[in-house]
């Protein structure tokens, strides 16, 4: 399934002809369950099918440095409480990059103003730098992937003949994960931990769309 999504996302831009194309830059905030609220930056390209529908693709980037409290609790429960050290072990630097195919419908509600509803399906890649359990001053790297979907709506305002400004509110869903084994050098106890990153949450963004 993931391979089919990747192939579809790669060939989608080739089907979008030059006529009626647009590009959008989006900035805002994203509040996934796994991390605290942070800044998110995105680009969406696409083509207008008619006066209502458009299709396209989007790519976003979200970065957060945080302490995984769920992992801290697991370390405390299994290896014994050592809050300060386990918090260091649970420090995580996460980069989320969802790539999605999108469909948007919009309708006029006033002069130069339209409301829109949008949806997307695709794949989310997480690039994760996390601390080594035995040597928490050292970073290790892992990539995780999962299916992603998004639903949203907003308001579009026509600035000029080839430019719009817009605001949108969307809900994003994805839960990439992976498993790894940790062995405590003092107790000799081993455990397989699952790092699940619940990237589901609300995002609020503003942006500009340019037609060419």
Where are these regions (language model features)?
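Sec-dependent N-terminal signal peptides
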Residues: 4-13
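Residues that define the transmembrane beta-barrel architecture of outer-membrane proteins
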Residues: 19-21, 37-41, 93-99, 143-149, ...
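Flexible, solvent-exposed coil segments and beta strand-coil junctions
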Residues: 19-26, 77-85, 128-136, 184-188
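Extracellular loop and loop/strand-boundary signature of outer-membrane beta-barrel proteins
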Residues: 28-31, 85-91, 134-141, 189-195
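Surface-exposed strand-loop-strand hairpins of Gram-negative outer-membrane beta-barrel proteins
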Residues: 29-44, 70, 144
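Outer-membrane beta-barrel translocator domains and adjoining extracellular loop/strand segments
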Residues: 36-40, 67-74, 127-136, 178-186
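Gram-negative (and chloroplast) outer-membrane scaffold detector with strong preference
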Residues: 47-133, 157-162, 199-212
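Predominantly the C-terminal beta-signal and adjacent terminal strand-loop region
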Residues: 67-68, 151-212
